[in-house]
Amino acid sequence: MPLFGSIFSPKKTPPRKSASLSNLHSLDRSTRELELGLDYGTPTMNLAGQSLKFENGQWVADSVISGGVDRRETQRLRKRNQQLEEENNLLRLKVDILLDMLSETTAESHLKDKELDELKITNRRRK
């Protein structure tokens, strides 16, 4: 007699009958369209006392942002922030270019110093 025989294999359970838990089938067509229609409107939510709407892929404050700053002010600040970031990137690029120029000039200066030292040594040997 095997140690682990058929004692441990359970019987297969019969499949369950599908019973709809929804009462949508009992509603008439107009009520279903009203409840589940395609016109959902814009999604809105209230978060920390602030009403937000989902427009064009972004959550936007419905009226006034907490702290008294309105929508136009935030747009102006975002635009100014974008301008400052672009200016910052341009200035970083200029600094990188200037550092490259400085390192190139320094390398050329060291090469010329070496050449000058070698010429001095050869000139002293001739005398």
UniProtKB/Swiss-Prot annotation:
Q: Name one GO biological process term.
A: protein localization
What is the designated name of this protein?
Answer: Protein chibby homolog 1
* Function of the protein: Inhibits the Wnt/Wingless pathway by binding to CTNNB1/beta-catenin and inhibiting beta-catenin-mediated transcriptional activation through competition with TCF/LEF transcription factors. Has also been shown to play a role in regulating the intracellular trafficking of polycystin-2/PKD2 and possibly of other intracellular proteins. Promotes adipocyte and cardiomyocyte differentiation.
Family the UniProt entry places it in: Belongs to the chibby family.
Region (Disordered) residue ranges read 1-25
Lineage summary: Eukaryota, Metazoa, Chordata, Craniata, Vertebrata
Which is one GO molecular function term here? beta-catenin binding
**Which residue ranges does the record annotate as region Leucine-zipper?**
77-98
Give the region (Minimal region for the interaction with PKD2) as residue ranges: 60-112
* Any single GO CC term annotated in Swiss-Prot or TrEMBL for this entry: centriole
